[in-house]
Each structure stands twice: as C-alpha cells, then as structure tokens.
C-alpha cells in the first residue's frame, strides 16, 4: 500500500478555473537525498512515522514520481514589490503539489520549493539552494515555536544538481505546509486584469475556506477584509515584540490569512537596532525593522484597492483606520506580558519607550535583556544593569520598572515564571543559521537537528544546548542577507 493511501486529500484549489494556475510537473534533481524531516509536523499532518528512510516519500515529495493524488500547479498572482506594481509574478520555482487534511481537520497545502522552471520563472532557473532552504526550514519552525502565525516546513532534500548563483551551489528542495498560499497579490492580479467574476469567486472561496464566520454577515466581503486587517495587525505586532525583521514585505509575500510567509533575507534582532535593514537589496530601508508596522498598513491599503469592486470605499477605509490601534493594542499587550505586567497603568507607554531608548542607545542584546528580566527571581537587578553600557541610565530604568512591578498583585516568582513563557532563551540568530548552512553544505545536518530541538521550545532551558544561546561573534552581528536563493 502506498503511504499516500493513508492520507486524506482535499485538492480544492485546483478545482478553481485554470486561469488561477498552470498545471506543470516538477523538474527532477539528480541524486536527491533527505536533509531533514519534521517529525512533529508530519505527525500533525497524519503522515506515518518513519526515520527519513522512506524511499517512496523521498521520490514523491521531491517530484521525481507523481502519486495519483497529486495535481501539481504553479499559482498565478501579481504584487507590489518595493512599492511598484509588478503584474508578471507567480510561482516561479514552487509548485502546489496537493492539499491534505490534517488530524485537526484543517486542510494544508503541500508546496514544493525549488521544483524547477514554471511559466512564471521569468529569468530564473526555478531552483532553490541549500542556503535559502535551510534558512526557511529553520525560521518557519522558530516562528511556530514562538507562537507567531507562520507557514511550516515539512522536509528538506539536497541533490547533486549544480545551481549557479554568485558561485556554484547545489540544488535543494523544501516542502512547505500551510493552510493557504493565497496572497494579497492574488486579488491584485485579478483586479488589475479586470477579471472580476474570478475575483469575486476567489473572495467567495477565501471566505468559505478561511473566514466562514463572515458568511452570515450582512457585508461578507467587508467582514473578510476586517478579519484580514486584524490578523495582519496581530502578526506585525508579534514580529515587533519578538524582534523579527522580515526583510521583503512585498504584497506578493503577504498571506491572506495573516501568516508569516516567504522567508528570505529575514533576521531576528541581536543588538537592538530599530533601523535594522537585513536585506542588502533594500537600499532605501523601505522594509527596515521599524518600518514594518507602516508597511503592513501600506500593503493592506493596496489590498483594499484591489477589493474595491466588492467592498464599499467607506467600509474599506473604516477597516484600514482600525489597523494602527489594533496593532498598537496587540503590541502593548505583548510588551506587558514580556515585562510581567498583567494590569494596565498610566505610564506604561513611557516605560516601554524609555526601555527601547535605553536598548537602542546602548546596543543591548534584545532577547538577552528580556530573558535576564525574566530571571529576576534568582538574579539581582544588577545583572540587568550590567547588560547596558550606560549603567546610570540602566539603573534608573530598572528602578522605575521595579516600582511599576510593585503595582502588580503577583509575586516575583509568579511574575518571572510567566515571563519565561514569553521571553525565549533561544532564537534563530543569523550566525547560528549560517553555521548550520555551512555544515549542511558538507552533508552534515547535526546543527539543524540541534537547532530544531531548542527552536521547538525556545522558552525551556535545554542545558545540553547552552551554546546555542550564546551571543553572536563579531562576524555574526547585523548580517545582511541576499534575496538570492
């Protein structure tokens, strides 16, 4: 019996008209081998347990053999890239292989990245390399561990097929799993090409599949947009609170269901720098860390324009006006949790602002600062102060923080226990990802395996992996990453 016979399929996207996609077969790579298999996610999706030895799964997920349940397609969409509309986008190196029903009953896309040329590849070769594949695999699972909405990564495979970027590299494959691959750019494409019947059909399907609570609303499309605004606001707030810089927030990289999507030149903050630009192609800093909330609104405005045939202008504007207060509300709530403050008090905003000023002016390590605060049940206030160059300013802030904590009903021990559940000890620092890539390119997945342990539960101590909580070496600070993959 085939392994696929034990899995339920729901290939609903390919039931849409052909103008939404192009059927196409993956182009096989040479001598494909497993690099990683995500056992936890595989179990959630209903795959049988195995130790990366299934030849059938390797052959089918790599695209070498097509099971009868698969119907691989390249999706068509458009999008605004660095603020300019580009109509010529689509899945240029990835294919939606199939949609499976997880144990939870939710439908998940299985998407193969690096599958070869498609009609939307433009000048590209349709391939991915080990470098970018490892980064997405690790980061999507790191985000899941931080409880940030995200696509997931099921598997990685390597090959002997040469791929040429700045130098020769080796072709690799990533199997991504997500509840949806529908992007803001799907609606933009249909709107700008005046395919309004199909545009409405897509909106109907998005509501049916992802926002069924909107079906009974008097204005279902407006209700859908409200949901998208809210989910995007929460996602961006989670990015900011956790120090995540996406790097390339084009509208074709924005998920319609508010999941972090398309990991490329991302970074997690080491030293706190609100102006961090992690994408070396972002010459103007459009997607700098501190610009992400503004760009979230810009992208939603672009989506709103493309939804204008379905939603009244007043309803679109009303939803957009809610984005900033929603995002700020989510962010304030997250910062209170990170600081162990369960109640709201006047002056909290100033406490946050002065904290960020202190960290920015003194290049304080962002995750280390919050994790140290979380351990004040066993550490001294001086341990927090010692993280900061300007000790006098640090002491002033710590004194103000401890005075604010006195307004809480919880004990220090209770407060710190809760803080350790939201302030990770382990994050995917870029230098750790690079070390894992270097080993993976030599056929060694041990660093990937170790990182997957701590990233799955980044709040635990993991004493055997203490070295993965180390601050970056000089070469690993403020790394700028290329979009090339």
Curated annotation (Swiss-Prot):
Catalytic positions are 252 (proton acceptor)
A Gene Ontology molecular function term for this protein is: ATP binding
- Which controlled-vocabulary keywords does the entry list? ATP-binding, Magnesium, Manganese, Metal-binding, Nucleotide-binding, Nucleotidyltransferase, Transferase
Q: InterPro entries in the record, alphabetically? A: SelO
Pfam families reported for this sequence = SelO
Listed cofactors = Mg(2+); Mn(2+)
Q: EC annotation?
A: 2.7.7.-, 2.7.7.108
- Locate the residues binding ATP: 90, 92-93, 113, 125-126, 176, 183, 262
Q: Which reaction does it catalyse?
A: L-seryl-[protein] + ATP = 3-O-(5'-adenylyl)-L-seryl-[protein] + diphosphate; L-threonyl-[protein] + ATP = 3-O-(5'-adenylyl)-L-threonyl-[protein] + diphosphate; L-tyrosyl-[protein] + ATP = O-(5'-adenylyl)-L-tyrosyl-[protein] + diphosphate; L-histidyl-[protein] + UTP = N(tele)-(5'-uridylyl)-L-histidyl-[protein] + diphosphate
The keyword Electron transport is annotated on this UniProt entry:
no
Binding positions for Mg(2+)? 253, 262
Query: PANTHER family from the xrefs?
Result: PROTEIN ADENYLYLTRANSFERASE SELO, MITOCHONDRIAL (PTHR32057:SF14)
This molecule's function is given as: Nucleotidyltransferase involved in the post-translational modification of proteins. It can catalyze the addition of adenosine monophosphate (AMP) or uridine monophosphate (UMP) to a protein, resulting in modifications known as AMPylation and UMPylation.
Please give the HAMAP family that the UniProt record associates with this protein: YdiU_SelO
Say which family it is in. Belongs to the SELO family.
The protein depicted here goes by the name Protein nucleotidyltransferase YdiU
Name the species this protein comes from. Vibrio atlanticus (strain LGP32)
User: Lineage from the top down?
Assistant: Bacteria, Pseudomonadati, Pseudomonadota, Gammaproteobacteria, Vibrionales
- Gene (UniProt): ydiU
């Amino acid at each position: 019996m085939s392994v696929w016979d034990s899995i339920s399929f729901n290939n609903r996207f390919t039931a849409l008209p052909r103008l939404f996609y192009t059927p196409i077969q993956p182009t096989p790579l040479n001598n494909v081998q497993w690099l990683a298999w995500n056992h936890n996610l595989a179990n959630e999706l209903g795959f049988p347990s195995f130790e990366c030895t299934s030849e059938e799964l390797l052959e089918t997920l790599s695209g070498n053999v097509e099971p009868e349940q698969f119907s691989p397609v390249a999706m068509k969409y458009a999008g605004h890239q660095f603020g300019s509309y580009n109509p010529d986008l689509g899945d240029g190196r990835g294919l939606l292989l199939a949609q499976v029903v997880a144990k939870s009953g939710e439908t998940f896309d299985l998407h193969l990245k690096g599958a070869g040329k498609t009609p939307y590849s433009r000048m590209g070769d349709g391939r991915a390399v080990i470098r970018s594949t490892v980064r997405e695999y690790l980061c999507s699972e790191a985000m899941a561990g931080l409880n940030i909405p995200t696509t997931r990564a099921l598997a990685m495979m390597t090959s002997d097929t040469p791929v040429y970027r700045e130098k020769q590299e080796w072709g690799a494959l990533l199997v991504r799993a997500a509840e949806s691959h529908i992007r803001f750019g799907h609606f933009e494409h249909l709107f700008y090409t005046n395919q309004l019947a199909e545009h409405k059909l897509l909106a109907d399907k998005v509501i049916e599949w992802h926002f069924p609570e909107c079906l009974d609303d008097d204005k279902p499309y407006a209700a859908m947009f409200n949901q998208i605004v809210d989910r995007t606001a929460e996602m961006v707030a989670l990015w900011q609170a956790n120090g995540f810089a996406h790097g390339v927030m084009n509208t074709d990289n924005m998920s319609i269901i508010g999941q972090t999507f398309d990991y490329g030149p991302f970074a997690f903050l080491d030293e706190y720098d609100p102006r961090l630009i992690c994408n070396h192609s972002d010459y103007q800093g459009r997607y700098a860390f501190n610009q992400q909330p503004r760009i979230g609104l810009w992208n939603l405005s672009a989506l709103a324009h493309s939804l204008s045939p379905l939603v009244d202008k007043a309803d679109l504007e009303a939803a957009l006006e809610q984005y900033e207060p929603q995002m700020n509300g989510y962010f304030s709530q997250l910062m209170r949790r990170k600081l162990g403050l369960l109640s709201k008090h006047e002056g909290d905003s100033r406490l946050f602002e002065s904290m960020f000023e202190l960290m920015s002016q003194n290049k304080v390590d962002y995750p280390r600062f919050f994790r140290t605060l979380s351990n004040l049940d066993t550490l001294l206030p001086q341990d927090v102060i010692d993280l900061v160059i300007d000790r006098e300013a640090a002491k002033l802030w710590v004194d103000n923080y401890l005075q604010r904590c006195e307004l809480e009903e919880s004990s220090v021990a209770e407060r710190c226990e809760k803080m350790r559940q939201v302030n990770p000890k382990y994050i995917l620092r870029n230098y750790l990802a690079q070390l894992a890539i270097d080993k993976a390119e030599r056929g060694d997945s041990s660093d990937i395996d170790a990182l997957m342990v701590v990233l799955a539960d980044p709040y635990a101590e993991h004493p055997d992996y203490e070295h993965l909580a180390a601050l970056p070496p000089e070469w690993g600070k403020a790394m700028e990453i290329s979009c090339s993959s």
